[in-house]
């Protein structure tokens, strides 16, 4: 509280105060702080993540999912944090026995915008492998990895193996060039 009073223009301290309120069973106060922070800066990743935590704790599943999507589509948020959010979504999805549709839709939305690195695409491909999806489904993801990281040997090798399994030697040659 002292830091948020001392630095009233710093959203970080206010959001941290909101997190503290949420942890100490004061959800109404936490919600008001998160709402104010997001009204001031709708792209504030810390406030978005805190709001998602609020919705989850309050059992507001549909709002929780929407807030997760907002976090994942936030261009100010680094790929490592987005990957961590996706890992959590995947874990929850696996634990509840849901199908992979929502997870794949989230990956698709994330990969439809330019990526700073191959972290999200690599996680997506790993998920597809875990789900034993058909090779053809993973090809665009492998190509996305190579688009961002042309020297990614693992992605290039996987793409090459797909081409060889399909006896598409012209494609195999193209991949090796």
Report each predicted region and the residues it spans.
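Alpha-solenoid helical repeat scaffolds
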Residues: 1-177
């Amino acid at each position: 509280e002292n830091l948020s009073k001392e630095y009233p223009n710093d959203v970080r301290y206010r959001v941290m105060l909101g997190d503290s309120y949420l942890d100490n069973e004061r959800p109404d106060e936490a919600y008001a702080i998160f709402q104010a922070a997001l009204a001031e800066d709708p792209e504030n990743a810390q406030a978005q993540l805190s709001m998602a935590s609020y919705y989850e704790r309050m059992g507001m599943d549909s709002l929780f999912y929407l807030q997760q999507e907002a976090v994942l589509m936030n261009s100010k948020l680094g790929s490592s944090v987005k990957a961590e959010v996706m890992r959590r979504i995947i874990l929850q999805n696996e634990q509840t026995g849901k199908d992979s549709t929502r997870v794949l839709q989230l990956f698709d939305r994330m990969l439809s915008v330019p990526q700073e690195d191959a972290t999200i695409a690599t996680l997506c491909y790993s998920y597809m492998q875990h789900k034993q999806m058909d090779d053809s489904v993973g090809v665009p993801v492998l190509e996305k990895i190579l688009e961002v990281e042309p020297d990614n040997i693992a992605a290039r090798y996987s793409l090459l193996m797909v081409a060889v399994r399909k006896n598409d030697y012209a494609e195999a040659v193209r991949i090796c060039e």
